[in-house]
Amino acid sequence: MACGPGNGRACHEDGTMWGAPACLRAVGAPRTTRKKKNNNMLKVIFDTDPGVDDALALLYLHKHAQIDLIGVTTTFGNASVESTTHNALYLKQAWGFAAPVARGAAGPLQPEATPEAWPVHIHGHNGLGNHPVPAQLDVAADARPAHQLIIDLVRAHPGEVTLVAVGRMTNLALALQQAPDIAGLVRGVVLMGGAFHVNGNITPAAEANIWGDAEAADLVFTTDWPVTAIGLDVTTRVEMNRDGLDTLAALGGADAELVRALSQDYVDFYLQAGHKGMVVHDCCACIALTRPELFQFERASVRVATDGVARGMTIPKPEGMGFGPSVWDGHVLQSVAIGVDAAAVLADIEQTLKV
């Protein structure tokens, strides 16, 4: 919860709570840090719902030498879109990335859908693990809605932009509905979502990002553009414990220290759930872009169940497997991750965040 008038929380002059760690109090005015660009860099729009693991993924993209982060778009999911947008702007101010931040969808494509409860037991009441976030920031969101920013940037850089989507797929679906031509203009889509040969994490059938807007996810999977899906089949194998977070903070300075600080309750949740540390869901999707050799993939057409008890279930039809006529027929084959070198993924995060 942010400090401010009426909520009984005392603040420093910069708007942060008393007792906030130095990594927060030192944010101050927005920084701007720029990487030296080259022609081999991958242009990325990061569609996100920050979100604790989203923060780590965003820092990874910001720090990676071969990533040109050209846009950040927000959506509902780990918290309301108001909170996730504020969180993305806070991280922009703290870390100094230049990419515009655009506010996106507040709910799923289907307006009659039952509003979902935010996962406060995982990501805290503010989406960033209850880590104190200033109520007032010195950076502002782009005037365009997220789907329009996606359309504009993809059209401005045909064949060059990869969409890395780690929340509900609503912004991507809205962009496709408004501008179907972008499907032929993107370099690719990498998403964190789905449970293809394992159980889900919000229901036995469904992973949360897909369940939260199943119609949007089905559109994303069945559109004729290249999708790489990084689901629970692999992300749940990549766990970072407190020692790993401490190492990141030691290697990565103040930027990584902020990730360490806001991840503490998130680690607790996963330890209580039987894991060895926090599951690094979203950063896996980023690393599938920069280091695809660390993953094993199958090719499959994918459909998403959009109603009933299995709503949000991602159902692959593997390449070459024969069935009778079905709703999978005629749809493009996508890449679905089924294996991962977890140790190498964690090592790559450390190497990328190292100052």
Task: Please give the residue ranges for each predicted region.
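Short hydrophobic alpha-helical segments enriched in small aliphatic residues
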Residues: 8, 13-15
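A residue-level signal for conserved active-site and pocket-lining positions in enzyme catalytic cores
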Residues: 101, 220, 286
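Short Gly/Ser/Thr- and charged-rich N-terminal loops/segments
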Residues: 25-28
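Conformational coupling and interaction surfaces
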Residues: 41, 60-61, 68-69, 211, ...
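Polybasic, lysine-rich low-complexity intrinsically disordered segments
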Residues: 35-38
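Metal-dependent C-N hydrolase catalytic cores
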Residues: 85-156, 331-340, 350
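Intrinsic, low-complexity polybasic segments
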Residues: 5, 18-22
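Active-site histidine-anchored catalytic micro-motif
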Residues: 40-90, 130-236, 242
